[in-house]
């Protein structure tokens, strides 16, 4: 009786491992829409922060340029981590 339980447990573990590897392959595929969304959203957040900071300090578009570049870098970093 114990050997039957042991075989059952081993079969369940084997099924779980095969299920886990099949799901990881699905998650490795990167959706192009997700890439575009990450890049555009990072840039837009940088633009928004830059515009608001320029209005707050009443300055030329210095902060707009700085935060736009930072937003683009953040978008590329998010894509790279995926």
Curated annotation (Swiss-Prot):
Bilayer disposition of the protein: Multi-pass membrane protein
Main location as per UniProt: membrane
Ranges annotated as spanning the membrane: 32-52, 59-79
Alphabetical UniProt keywords: Cell membrane, Membrane, Transmembrane, Transmembrane helix
Domain of life: Bacteria
Family matches, as InterPro entries: ATPase_put
One annotated Gene Ontology cellular component of this protein: plasma membrane
Compartments (UniProt record): Cell membrane
Protein name: Uncharacterized protein RP024
């Amino acid at each position: 009786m114990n050997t039957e339980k042991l075989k059952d447990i081993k079969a369940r573990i084997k099924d779980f491992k095969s299920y886990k590897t099949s799901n990881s392959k699905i998650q490795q595929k990167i959706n192009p829409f997700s890439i575009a969304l990450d890049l555009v959203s990072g840039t837009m957040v940088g633009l928004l922060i830059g515009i608001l900071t320029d209005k707050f300090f009443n300055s030329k578009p210095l902060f707009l340029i700085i935060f736009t570049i930072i937003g683009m870098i953040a978008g590329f970093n998010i894509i790279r981590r995926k």
